Amino acid sequence: MTTINQLVRKPRVSKKEKSNVPALEGCPQRRGVCTRVYTTTPKKPNSALRKVARVRLTNGAEVTSYIGGEGHNLQEHSVILIRGGRVKDLPGVRYHVVRGSLDTAGVQKRRQGRSKYGAKRPKS
């Protein structure tokens, strides 16, 4: 246990919390340009071809972000918006593409959970 005198001389230092999404720099989303759009395979025990994009952000950071939903229209030089959120079975992927904003189209024929995929309300 420290004495009052010791604390007066040298106060306690609080630990800094490390961010899971450092490239966003505290912002909720960031704009960027796709430098490469490709598919990659997940870790064991899963098996698939996950769609990801390498993105150069406006702050100069280059990150890998996941393209959720069925089908997408992204290609090189597409301007996209990314948000935080990792993909557990893809190492190094800590960001998600925001569907339905900027150059990214929403998911077609999406009926449920539409807001997560930028899909408009269907005509009833």
From Swiss-Prot:
Residues 108-124 have a biased composition (Basic residues). GO terms for cellular component: small ribosomal subunit. PROSITE patterns: RIBOSOMAL_S12. InterPro entries: NA-bd_OB-fold, Ribosomal_uS12, Ribosomal_uS12_bac. Residues 103-124 are annotated as: Disordered. It comes from the Bacteria. One of its GO terms (molecular function) is structural constituent of ribosome. GO terms for biological process: translation. NCBIfam families: rpsL_bact (TIGR00981). Belongs to the universal ribosomal protein uS12 family. This is Small ribosomal subunit protein uS12. It comes from Methylococcus capsulatus (strain ATCC 33009 / NCIMB 11132 / Bath). The gene is rpsL.
